[in-house]
């Protein structure tokens, strides 16, 4: 029975076969970008490991420590990044290190991005916490885009730890 006069709203479009589409075949630029990063000469200021307390979400003073998880400081004071300093002390002199506390230096994202280029860290190590997670990940993104391997620690690095640990 053919119903040519039926309104399109009354026809069950889900009952017909949908042709399979081929997968998108985008060019892979990874090798070219990676080669360009490796070919670039390292500056005299380049470090092995950059330990970072990234810029804060709103430019205010925030606390990122294991026992004061990612909150604005009520006291309006800078909490020193003792954990980053301790790790730097353990890594030096075997590795060249740079500790950057953007919170203490009142450094914004633009200034921090400009700081990454001369130091060209091989590894970017930072503390993360749930309240500032998106902000903290942006720092990792900037470092990774410049060829650094990123390392994060903290109380709430991810809401999906099992998925994160998969290869």
Question: Which sequence ranges carry the predicted segments?
Answer:
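Glycine-rich beta-alpha loop elements in corrinoid/cobalamin-binding modules
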Residues: 83, 90-167
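Flexible, charged surface loops at secondary-structure boundaries
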Residues: 41-45, 117-120
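Conserved alpha-helical elements of sugar-nucleotide-dependent glycosyltransferases
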Residues: 76-86
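Non-catalytic N-terminal targeting/anchoring module and adjacent flexible stem/linker
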Residues: 1-42
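Short glycine-rich His-centered loop
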Residues: 26, 32, 39, 45-78
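Short, flexible segments with low predicted structural confidence
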Residues: 58-63, 88, 114-115
